[in-house]
């Protein structure tokens, strides 16, 4: 297997990114797809594209995908209340477990929404239960690498007219993240016109319509229980995962 990583930017700002794990015979085909994806991105034609291809020598981990649950909402305000409640329900367990004041959860979630609404991070922010940023580079964030889905899962998702390639990408990331020990994930797309976001927990991948407004930036935040940041970075970046 080979890892393909595409990153595209314009004037130093992130435009597009994607990860694939493929067999040797599919390298050329998938490389072409990734470049076309970068060049056709709605956020603008990039002036820089990096495509990195590496042989994967580690054992591939096969993970069952999180259950996909779609939450319908017609307004950003309602969607954010729904997202907040999903996050609070999950985070509260860990606050109580660690003897922390559950009244502080709202502040943590407020901070997370502030981060994603500012946008322009290449990767995800990481917040512990006290609201500390744990990324080694707060501008870059952390990127989840060495991931893909099986063809069968991809075809199943794309067979649903309400889902898209973005769902395929997101379910791969969300499934790996939760299996690496992240409590929950909050995400909105960096595609300006794609307003569906999601919350991921061990209970599922919750697609929430209208989690951001049309034309707005997006971002990603991981909530974690402890500060074993080096171990988390290693898993998220280096552990090869195929989601089925």
Swiss-Prot record:
The keyword Cell division does not apply. Pathway: Metabolic intermediate metabolism; pimeloyl-CoA biosynthesis; pimeloyl-CoA from pimelate: step 1/1. GO terms for biological process: biotin biosynthetic process. The keyword Nucleotide-binding applies. It comes from the Archaea. Belongs to the BioW family. NCBIfam families: PRK01322.1. Homodimer. This is 6-carboxyhexanoate--CoA ligase. The lineage of its organism: Archaea, Methanobacteriati, Methanobacteriota, Methanomada group, Methanococci.
